[in-house]
Amino acid sequence: MYNLKGKKLLILAGAGVHNKVVRAAKEMGIYTIVTDYLPDSPAKKLADEAWMLNITDVDAIVEKCKEEHVDGVMNFCIDPAQKPYYEICKRLNLPCIGTKETFDVLTDKRTFKDYCVQHGVDVIPEYTEEDVMKGNVEYPLFIKPTNSRGSRGQSVCYSKEEAIKGIAFAKTESSDGGFVCEKYMEKYQDIGSAFFVVDGEPYLVKFGDRHLGKPEDNLNKQVVCTKLPSDSSDMFEACVIDRVKEMIKSLGIKFGPVFLQGFVDGNTIRYYDPAQRMPGGDYDVILEKATGFSTVRSWITFALTGDVKGAVGNPKQCYRLNGGTALLLTVTVRPGKMEKILGFDDVLKMSHVIYGRQIIPEGEIIPATGDIAQRVAAFGLLIDRDVDIQECLDSVYNTYRVLDENGNSMVISKYKYEGEKNEK
C-alpha cells in the first residue's frame, strides 16, 4: 500500500456524488482540491481547497495545477468532465484512465454503437433521418442527442411529425449537433453495467435493473430505482459478458471504469449508452461495504501513482454483493414548491440504509420537466438475503416526506418491488 499522505488531488466538479471521493481521499491523508464554476458545490464544502475554475477551462486548470504542484487529477462520475479530464492529464503528464481513442468511443453514442457492431456486441436497431422522412421506420421511436447530460434532449415519438420535432430537439441538446434514432425499447428491462479494469482485465462491479417512473407522472424516462444485482445476472454471465470484456480489452484500457447501459432482450443485452467513468450515485459506498472492493480508493491510488495493479480490495464477482440486494432509490416529486422536508435524518438511522443525499433543498420550486430536475433525494439500501425487501422500501417511503404548501405529499413514482423475474 502506498503512503499518499500530503499528495495533492484535484477533483473535477463538486457535485454531491463526488463527496465520497473527497471523504475517501482525506481519510487517506491526501490534500483535496475541487474545482467548478459554482461557489457552493457540495464537495467543495468538504475539500481542503476550492477553485472557481470551470471544468471545461482546460488551459486555466492546467496552469493552476502547475502553480500548486498538483500530483493527480480525477473525474469520478461526471459526464461533461470526461474529455477535459483527459486533456488535463495529458498536458500535465499525469496518470489517466484513458486515451483520446477510448474517450472518443465511450463518450459518443454514435461512435460507440459502431464499435459495438464491429466487436459482436448487440445494439438497438437504428434509423437515419432519411428513414424517418421516407417512412421506413417502425414506431414508436426513441430519439436522443449523440452526447448530452442526463436525459436532456430525449423524445419518444409515435409519428413522423413527432419524429421530425424530436430530431430537431435532440440536435439542439447535443454538443456536436448529432442525434441517434432507435427502436423504442419501452417494454424491455433497462440495465446499467459497470466494469472496473485492473491491469488490463475488466471486472464486472455493477449490474443492475433500472426501473423507471410512471408515464402518468411524466417520469417514464427517469430512473426511480436500480436493483442490484440484476435478475438477468446468470444470463449475462452465460451469454454476453465475454463479448463485452473482449470489446473493452480491444480499447487497450489498463485501469479504471467503463460504464455501459443497455436493454435485456432474450439472451442478450442491447447496449445504447457508454461512458468512461463510474455511474452517478453512491453505489460505490454500498459495494465497498458489501465486498471490501473500493472503486473510489482504487482510482484515487491510480491517479496519484499510475499503478494499474493498485486495486483496493478484490473486484472478482463483487457485483453479486455477497448475496445481498442493493436498491438505489431516487425520490421524485411532482411540480410545485417543496415547503417542508421531513424524516431525512431518521431514514439515515435505519440499519439497511447505507447512504442518503438531499439533492434539492427545502423551499425550492420543482418544474414540470420530467427529467433530473424532479429528483430531490437519493438513498442507498443494502438488504440481507433473508430480509423482506418491500418492508425496507416502505420504511423509507413512510419516513421521508416532501410536503407542498398545503401539507400534501409531493412524492410520486414510488418504486414497488415485484420479486425476481428470472430464476437465479
What are these regions (language model features)?
Residues 183-190, 194-253, 257, 264, ...:
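ATP-dependent carboxylate/phosphate-activation module, predominantly the ATP-grasp catalytic core
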